[in-house]
Structures are given as C-alpha cells and as structure tokens.
C-alpha cells in the first residue's frame, strides 16, 4: 500500500457504499501468484474502513484474451482467473461474475458490454432479493 493509494481512497470514505463491482486485473497477471492474497486483503480493508463486514463484492472475471497459439500467456490468464475464483469461493459475500466467454483474442477489452452488464445486474438483484427475504 502506498501513500498515493490512501490519498485516492480517502475522499470516498465520506460516501455511502452498498457494494463494490471490481473490474480489474489485466495489469496484475504477472503477479497472479500473490493476487488472491492481495485482493482478499483489499476486500477486508475496504469492509473495515466502511464498517460493513458483509459489504458485497462482485469480481468481474478477467476476460479471455490472446491468440490461441500463445500457450504461455493463455495459461497465465487462466491461472489469474483461478485466483479470482478462489477469492470468491473463500470470502463471504463475494461473487465472481463470468466474463471469460466474452473476450476477444485481439482486444483486451471485450466488445460485448451489454451481456456483461446484464450479468452484473442479475448478480446484484439476486443478492438484494436474498437479503430482503431475511
């Protein structure tokens, strides 16, 4: 954690946050072996700072990317997605939203935003409806 990170986040603490949609990771594929611990620590930190131990986190799965012939790169991206899935599986109220099927081999940003948006909305609505039934 750097001082810049604290500076950037500090103003957000004045806002009410109901949940977090986390869509990030392309630049961290090279650190995939430590990503699970880093993301878990961030989730814990944000929940503590907002005083919401059950604040939902929605992790957008890293989209598939790279040519099918780039075996090393594709393996690294698959390992990164596995780390994302493990964070969702081992932390309360964390949901992984599938995105790997929407990727483009030649564009790091999937073109199909509508399908992903519908998946995110559906996950949030399921969580809200479950919470309202309790």
Predicted regions and their residues:
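Active-site segments of SGNH/GDSL-like serine hydrolases
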Residues: 49-77
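Active-site-proximal beta-strand/loop segments in catalytic clefts of secreted hydrolases
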Residues: 22-27, 46, 60-64, 98-102
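Catalytic cores of secreted or luminal carbohydrate-active enzymes
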Residues: 82-98, 103-134
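Loop/turn elements at helix/coil->beta-strand transitions in domains of secreted/extracellular proteins
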Residues: 15-19, 52-58, 89-96
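Short, small-residue-biased leader/transition segments that mark boundaries at the very start
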Residues: 2-7
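Extracytoplasmic/secreted proteins, especially bacterial periplasmic and envelope-associated proteins
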Residues: 34-41, 45, 75, 79-83, ...
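Oxyanion-hole/transition-state-stabilizing segment in secreted/luminal serine hydrolases
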Residues: 8-30
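The substrate-binding groove and active-site-proximal loops of carbohydrate-active enzymes
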Residues: 23-36, 68-73
């Amino acid at each position: 954690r750097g001082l810049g990170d604290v500076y950037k986040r500090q103003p957000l603490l004045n806002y009410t946050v109901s949940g977090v949609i986390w869509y990030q990771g392309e630049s961290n594929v090279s650190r995939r072996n430590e990503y699970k611990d880093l993301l878990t620590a961030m989730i814990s930190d944000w929940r503590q700072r907002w005083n919401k131990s059950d604040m939902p986190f929605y992790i957008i799965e890293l989209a598939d990317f790279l040519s099918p012939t780039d075996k090393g790169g594709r393996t690294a991206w698959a390992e990164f997605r596995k780390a994302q899935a493990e964070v969702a599986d081992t932390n309360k109220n964390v949901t992984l939203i599938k995105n790997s099927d929407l990727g483009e081999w030649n564009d790091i940003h999937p073109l199909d935003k509508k399908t992903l948006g519908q998946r995110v909305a559906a996950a949030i609505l399921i969580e809200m409806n479950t919470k309202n039934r309790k």
